């Protein structure tokens, strides 16, 4: 029988077991629902991996048990056959997986192409240590089939790295970057997503101030319209104080919508808005932000939602705040981009699609209170009321056009139940009903509304501080 044959030929039995082990190892990276456990760390160019691996492992240790497999480069570079690596390291890797939460498998500089390929093949995710002096083509082709995180060493990498690898995230090679990467790997990376709302969006800065002062660590930011401005400011690495100071200077201090013109494409020229985003963000690229960021706009041509994750920060924010009829749209190739609030004023679903952690949502949808009131004008009216009656031809006091446009966004945007989305940790709802949607001078009231709402959320959910 076949069993007798195996017993009589031990070499055949051993060869079959090795072949089966190899087949199992090579099929291992199939997608599963569990958190990634084997993390490949691959050095590109002359970047030394060892000190960074130590920093990543130390950061991961605060979330669980971590093992490191980093054989000497003299050993791995001398290997001539891929099967030799499979046979030599399969048992070591399996044993490390069984006894740890994460295993870092390291391909340092000079480790050899076969070992780099083995690391890429066996990993659930890859961390690539980027040396800008070397092209991304040097990274193993299997890297394009895995979620990739970039650690940027020395100079910031150019966009060709994003073209090649489409990384999930990128981090600077410092303690903050290693901590953020570890939280992503552990599934504890907190995201903050913020709604649009005109001047009411200034409440986001108060929310962020209260959260960060309480010790909440946020790695990812996203939003629409005024939420995009706040998201980009925080992703830029500004602390709450600096972000609020910038908001006072570039938003509250300049009245960005006060450059009205003959309404051919919009009621305003958009020049003040351009200066706002340029003053805030300059020529920074999204790829070079130290924290995760996206903004949302809408393409007037196709009707599609556009999620901005690459390119100019100023361009992404400018598109997201281009209220149709009020601010001129942004022409981008074959796209004509306007305020994302038309389709998704609070893009929580976009943020929640990232499986690396929970999400805090800041929702500004409240009962609409027009800044100038509404209803029948009294029989005896003040000169401004008389002028309004003459211009509108009605005895009804109606909201200004700008407020009507912004409120229409609230009504048209998705009304998805935030509590039904996966990974929503908290919903913060500042009471901004008394703040005019275009009254940017009410920044102090908006900030306080944000702080109060965040304070209430922290009291209800103290576990947000982690």
PLM region spans:
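Helix-rich "cap/lid" substructures immediately adjacent to catalytic or cofactor-binding pockets
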Residues: 177-221, 260
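Catalytic nucleophile loop
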Residues: 195, 217-236
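Non-catalytic peripheral regions of patatin-like phospholipases
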Residues: 146-167, 175-177, 190, 194, ...
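P-loop/Walker-type NTP enzyme "switch/lid" segment
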Residues: 43-45, 65-122, 287, 296, ...
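Phosphate-binding P-loop
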Residues: 29-36, 185-186
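Conserved catalytic-core segment of NTP-binding enzymes
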Residues: 92-93, 103-174, 365
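Cyclic-nucleotide recognition modules
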Residues: 1-17
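Glycine-rich phosphate-binding P-loop
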Residues: 35-62
């Amino acid at each position: 029988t076949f069993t007798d044959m195996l017993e009589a030929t031990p070499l055949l039995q051993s060869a079959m077991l090795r072949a089966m082990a190899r087949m199992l190892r090579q099929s291992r990276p199939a997608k599963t629902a569990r958190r990634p456990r084997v993390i490949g760390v691959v050095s590109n160019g002359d970047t030394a991996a060892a000190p960074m691996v130590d920093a990543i492992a130390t950061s991961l240790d605060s979330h669980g048990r971590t093992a490191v497999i980093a054989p000497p480069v003299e050993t791995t570079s001398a290997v001539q056959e891929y099967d030799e690596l499979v046979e030599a390291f399969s048992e070591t890797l399996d044993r490390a997986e069984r006894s740890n939460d994460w295993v870092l498998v390291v391909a340092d500089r000079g480790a050899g192409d076969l070992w780099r390929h083995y690391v890429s093949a066996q990993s659930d995710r890859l961390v690539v240590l980027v040396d800008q002096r070397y092209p991304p083509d040097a990274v193993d082709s299997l890297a394009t089939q895995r979620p990739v995180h970039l650690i940027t060493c020395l100079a910031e990498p150019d966009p060709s790295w994003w073209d090649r690898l489409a990384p999930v995230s990128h981090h600077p090679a410092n303690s903050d970057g290693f901590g953020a990467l570890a939280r992503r790997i552990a599934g504890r990376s907190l995201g903050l997503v913020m709604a649009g709302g005109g001047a009411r969006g200034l409440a986001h800065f108060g929310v962020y101030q209260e959260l960060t002062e309480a010790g909440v660590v946020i790695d990812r930011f996203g939003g629409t319209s005024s939420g995009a401005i706040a998201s980009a400011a925080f992703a830029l690495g500004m602390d709450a104080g600096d972000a609020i100071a910038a908001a006072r200077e570039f938003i509250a201090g300049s009245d960005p919508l006060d450059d009205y013109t003959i309404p051919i494409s919009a009621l305003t020229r958009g020049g003040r808005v351009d200066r706002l985003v340029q003053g805030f963000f300059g020529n920074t690229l999204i790829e070079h932000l130290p924290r995760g960021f996206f903004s949302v706009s809408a393409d007037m041509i196709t009707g599609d939602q556009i999620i901005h994750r690459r390119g100019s920060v100023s361009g992404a924010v400018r598109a997201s705040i281009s209220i149709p009829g009020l601010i001129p749209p942004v022409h981008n190739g074959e796209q004509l981009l306007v305020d994302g609030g038309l389709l998704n004023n609070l893009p929580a679903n976009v943020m929640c699609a990232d499986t690396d952690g929970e999400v805090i949502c800041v929702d500004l949808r409240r009962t609409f209170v027009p800044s100038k009131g509404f209803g029948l004008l009294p029989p005896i009216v003040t000169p401004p009321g008389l002028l309004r009656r003459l211009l509108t031809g009605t005895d009804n006091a109606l909201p200004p056009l700008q407020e009507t446009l912004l409120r229409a966004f609230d009504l048209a945007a998705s009304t998805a139940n935030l509590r039904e989305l996966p990974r929503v940790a908290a919903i913060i709802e500042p009471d901004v009903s008394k703040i005019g949607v275009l009254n940017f001078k009410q920044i102090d009231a908006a900030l306080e509304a944000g702080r109060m709402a965040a304070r209430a959320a922290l009291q209800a959910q103290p576990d947000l501080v982690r």
